[in-house]
């Protein structure tokens, strides 16, 4: 019986090994699936974070593309408005030129006004600087005329002669010159 026991023992051991191998083969796919499930569970949050980051980058890229398109449109409208800017530049040049002309005319009028005030007598006296013949003394005639005028105007004004009248009555030639330069 020893031989029978030994055979039973070996058969039992072999059947256990076969059973264990069958069990391993039967559970091996489930173990593989368990390992895959573990891996997916660990990697999924990182994948979702990357997915969100990609969506955010896509939105940013789309916004930058819109900005670039708006910039291109703005540049095209600026290129189209070149003629308008040239017209504005020409108008500015014309207005600067007109302003300079007005300034020149104003300064010319001012100089002319100043020169007419001061140089009329100078210009006329320059002509008189030539050798003029001696004029007769009109002092007496002028005194008589001034007295007649004072008498006609009134007796109160005869004594109130101005300094200019007194100065001109002493030198009748000067009076004559000044009257001619003012008219």
From Swiss-Prot:
Transmembrane segments: none
Biased composition (Polar residues): 159-183
Subcellular location field: Lysosome membrane
Species this chain originates from: Drosophila melanogaster
Alphabetized UniProt keyword annotations: Lysosome, Membrane
UniProt key word Zinc-finger: no
Main location, first listed in the record: membrane
Organism domain of life: Eukaryota
UniProt record similarity statement: Belongs to the BORCS8 family.
Pfam name, any one: BORCS8
Protein name, entry field: BLOC-1-related complex subunit 8 homolog
């Amino acid at each position: 019986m020893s031989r029978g026991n030994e055979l039973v023992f070996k058969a039992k051991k072999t059947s256990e090994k076969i059973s264990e191998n069958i069990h391993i083969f039967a559970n091996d796919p489930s173990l593989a699936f368990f390992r895959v499930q573990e891996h997916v569970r660990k990697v999924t949050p990182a994948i979702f974070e990357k997915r969100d980051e990609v969506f955010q980058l896509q939105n940013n890229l789309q916004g930058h593309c819109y900005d670039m398109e708006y910039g291109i449109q703005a540049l095209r409208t600026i290129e189209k408005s070149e003629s308008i800017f040239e017209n504005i530049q020409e108008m500015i040049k014309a207005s600067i030129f007109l302003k300079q002309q007005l300034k020149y005319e104003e300064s010319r009028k001012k100089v002319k006004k100043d020169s007419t005030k001061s140089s009329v007598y100078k210009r006329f006296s320059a002509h008189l600087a030539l050798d003029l013949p001696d004029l007769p003394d009109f002092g007496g005639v002028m005194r008589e005329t001034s007295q007649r005028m004072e008498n006609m105007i009134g007796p109160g004004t005869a004594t109130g002669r101005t300094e200019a009248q007194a100065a001109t009555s002493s030198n009748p030639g000067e009076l004559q010159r000044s009257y001619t330069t003012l008219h």
